[in-house]
Amino acid sequence: MLHNIKSSDSSHPLKGSWWGLLCAAFFFISCEGSSPTLDHPSTMQKSAKRGVSFNFTNIQDLPLLSPAISWSYNWANDQNSTSALWFDTNAMDFCPMCWNGSYSADKIRQYVQQHPNTKYLLGFNEPNLTDQCNMTPAQAAGPWQEVVALAKELNLKLISPAMNYGTLAGYHDPIKWFDEFFALPNVSLDDIHAIAIHCYMASPSAVKDYIKKFEKYGKPIWMTEFCAWDPVPSNVEKQMDYMCSVLNHMEQNPHVERYAWFMPRTSGKVDSPPYMQLLTHGSPVELTPLGQIFTQFSSFDKNAYLALDKGVGAHQYIALKDESISLRVTDNNQLYIQSFMQGQWIDYHVHVQSKQPLQIQYASIVNSQVCISIDGVAQAIVDLPKTSDLQTITTLTTTVIPPFGNHTLRLEALKGTFNCYQLRQ
């Protein structure tokens, strides 16, 4: 059942005139700064923040991840030539790293010379962990001066040592390590572009609080390792919920400049704890369901107005009320919102170029209801009758006919809960 709030005809004062419709379409397009060719995308630009911490040794991995990631690092001074070529031709940024004081400056120089688009140099890896870099602030300060000099020589932006909760006596707290390090007379915050941190806490709220701690340094934040691992998730669905909540936060957090998932593949089985692998083993390599979520996840690209007549995936939102909104994957690798429930809302940027009613693809085992708004104005309250089960996807045609041009379309759940798959005309 549809409860009209605003007549769809009122948006078209020139209804009935082909010339009027063309003028109206041109007016909307011109006002929104869109291309008059009506050639609008069906996907967003990939996220400039999204990356992985991973050593690409299998050529099959690159085309699966490169459409979604903008950068990567492998804890080393350089990467193999095959990966480097792929990075150069697919708008991906590789970041060399000085893992500890024993790095090879010559290897880094050679890599930067061969790949002049290299922009960043990563600092020491977890110096407050005894099984990693294992250095006190005072011990790190000496070799750090050489790293600073190398970054300046190569015109690279320098990223701080990457900190986690540690095992080094007296330095469990990464903030304590950083505070002492930056207070040393031969160390300066001015030498670094960003603060690097790692986090394996399985609670998304704990991750968000952890990120906030490092805002005190007034630098962009790079989360260069993260996944849910402490405590270990009981299944991959828990890892999916974690990923969605944390990515929803970091993509929208202006303090987070980059993040890198740990990691796309390990030596363990894909279906073994902590269930964080993005790629399968063997050949041909495929994305795991978690990998599908990671690569298709919204980049919150507010410049893209997706063609509504081509279908807008429910996961392609540009704003949302609740960061805990989670995604799942169908058998044909389509993402959908799981359990969209009362009190939650999601915004989409859509481009309309046909006078057709809005359709919603969904599944639900309870009767549900949503309010549809366009550009902040409620258009209709729509009843979503329950389907026979959550595997039965239903397409409901509403009476809402969006006006031509670019618009912000909001779905707000008023009652019930349902899985949402797609919006289209």
Label each residue range with its predicted role.
Residues 95, 262-311:
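Aromatic-rich peripheral "rim/lid" segments of glycoside hydrolase catalytic domains that contact
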Residues 166-169, 217-243, 262-280:
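Active-site clefts of carbohydrate-active enzymes
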Residues 115-137, 159-168, 190-199, 257-265:
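Active-site groove signature of glycoside hydrolases
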Residues 302-425:
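Extracytoplasmic
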Residues 49-51, 70-71, 91-95, 119-122, ...:
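Structural preference for beta-strand elements that scaffold enzyme active sites
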Residues 96, 125, 177-212, 217-230, ...:
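Aromatic- and acid-rich polysaccharide-binding/catalytic face
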Residues 21, 27-46:
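Bacterial Sec-dependent N-terminal signal peptides
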Residues 49-119:
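N-terminal carbohydrate-binding/catalytic regions of secreted carbohydrate-active enzymes
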